[in-house]
């Protein structure tokens, strides 16, 4: 009797799942394609413009540090021990300052990138929600899927819906 009940439940579950999947509308979004969209590229350009002046200043400071190091190496034999020590410390302090400013710039860029990507992800999620409601999707999945039919790939719709 127990075997019959288990078999009955198994068959019923299989029939129910086959019937349920026939009514399920599924969509797929390829996030790598979304992240290569014009909207995502605009974020990169915006951040580049925002931080370009600081990056240029750091490039100039790096050139100055390198020039001073080169001059110090070249002129070190002509300097007194005290002068050499003072100039070496000066160059070392400049190099430390440069490294600190580079770290700060990297941190600031990462913070702003995370802020902008969160806004972008919110726009993507909003577009997905609008498309899901409008087109009657029951399930929309992102990324790692073994196989995706072109008929359920809604990536282009999502990209078109971002920011609307």
Model-identified regions with their sequence ranges:
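Bacterial N-terminal signal peptides that target proteins for export
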Residues: 1-8
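N-terminal signal peptide c-region/cleavage motif recognized by signal peptidases
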Residues: 17-19
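A short, glycine/Asx- and small/polar-enriched loop/turn
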Residues: 150-154
């Amino acid at each position: 009797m127990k075997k019959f009940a288990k078999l009955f439940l198994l068959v019923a579950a299989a029939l129910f799942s086959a019937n349920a999947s026939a009514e399920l509308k599924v969509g797929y979004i390829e996030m790598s394609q979304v992240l290569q969209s014009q909207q995502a590229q605009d974020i990169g350009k915006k951040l580049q413009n925002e931080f370009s002046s600081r990056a240029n200043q750091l490039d100039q400071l790096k050139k100055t540090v390198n020039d001073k190091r080169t001059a110090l190496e070249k002129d070190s034999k002509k300097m007194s021990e005290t002068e050499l020590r003072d100039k070496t410390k000066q160059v070392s302090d400049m190099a430390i300052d440069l490294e600190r400013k580079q770290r700060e710039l990297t941190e600031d860029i990462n913070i702003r990138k995370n802020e902008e990507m969160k806004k972008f992800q919110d726009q993507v999620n909003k577009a997905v929600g609008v498309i899901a409601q409008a087109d009657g999707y029951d399930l929309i999945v992102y990324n790692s899927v073994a196989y995706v039919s072109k008929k359920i790939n809604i990536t282009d719709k999502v990209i078109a819906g971002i920011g609307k």
